Curated annotation (Swiss-Prot):
It is found in: Nucleus; Chromosome, Telomere. Component of the EKC/KEOPS complex composed of at least BUD32, CGI121, GON7, KAE1 and PCC1; the whole complex dimerizes. This is EKC/KEOPS complex subunit CGI121. One of its GO terms (biological process) is tRNA threonylcarbamoyladenosine modification. Pfam families: CGI-121 (PF08617). Component of the EKC/KEOPS complex that is required for the formation of a threonylcarbamoyl group on adenosine at position 37 (t(6)A37) in tRNAs that read codons beginning with adenine. The complex is probably involved in the transfer of the threonylcarbamoyl moiety of threonylcarbamoyl-AMP (TC-AMP) to the N6 group of A37. CGI121 acts as an allosteric effector that regulates the t(6)A activity of the complex. The EKC/KEOPS complex also promotes both telomere uncapping and telomere elongation. The complex is required for efficient recruitment of transcriptional coactivators.
Length: 197
């Protein structure tokens, strides 16, 4: 299985694993959503709809803020997984954040995040996690490519929806299209950081 391992310098006691699944079947997505709502511990992951995520920096910013809030007891959500989703949202409404950034049965792509204590990170734990995710998400049509900025911008993000969510339809961008992803990243992160101010 392909995944990104993120270590936060300020929080050496935790390790973040990020997986991308594409082509996940609608019944599987429906099952994931139902299990999350029921609180099934086998689904103790952060599942994200990547249509509103513009870059890895945008995703990392949300993860960092969620871990920071968790470590200092300032979480607005009940769980760290929901806090990651909430920190992607530009507005102060957890239910709206779950609706926009959580599992969407209409989107066959899914970013899956697991935050683990570094002390529990070893090859056996990664293999168990790998096997578990394959069991709950794999279908004949699903794939597990490496998550990077190119695949996010070219294949996953829906720019029209992203601009609507972050209210960027009237934003002026430089004429150089090569840095559009960078400009949108800065605006999206800024909107999240200023939420509620």
């Amino acid at each position: 299985m392909v995944y990104e391992e993120l270590k936060l310098a300020q929080f050496p006691n935790c390790t973040v694993l990020i997986f991308l699944f594409t082509g996940v079947d609608t019944p599987v997505l429906k099952q994931v959503k139902e299990q999350l709502i029921s609180g099934n511990k086998d689904y103790d992951f952060c599942f994200l709809n990547p249509q509103h995520i513009i870059s890895l920096e945008h995703l990392y910013s949300s993860i960092h803020k969620a871990v920071l809030n968790h470590e200092f007891g300032n979480m607005r959500a009940k769980t760290l997984n929901t806090e990651i989703i909430f920190n992607l949202s530009p507005i102060n409404n957890i239910m709206d954040a779950l609706k926009r950034f959580g599992v969407d049965e209409a989107c066959p792509n899914l970013i899956t995040i697991k935050v683990l204590p570094t002390s529990e990170c070893n090859e056996i734990a990664f293999k168990d996690l790998n096997d578990h995710l394959l069991k709950i998400l794999s279908t004949n049509d699903s794939h597990n490519p490496r998550l990077n900025n190119e695949i996010i911008f070219d294949s996953l993000v829906d720019l029209k929806k992203l601009k609507k969510v972050y209210k960027l339809n009237d934003a002026k961008f430089s004429k150089d299209e090569s840095d559009l992803q960078g400009e949108l990243t800065r605006l999206a992160i800024g909107a999240c950081q200023l939420r509620g101010c």
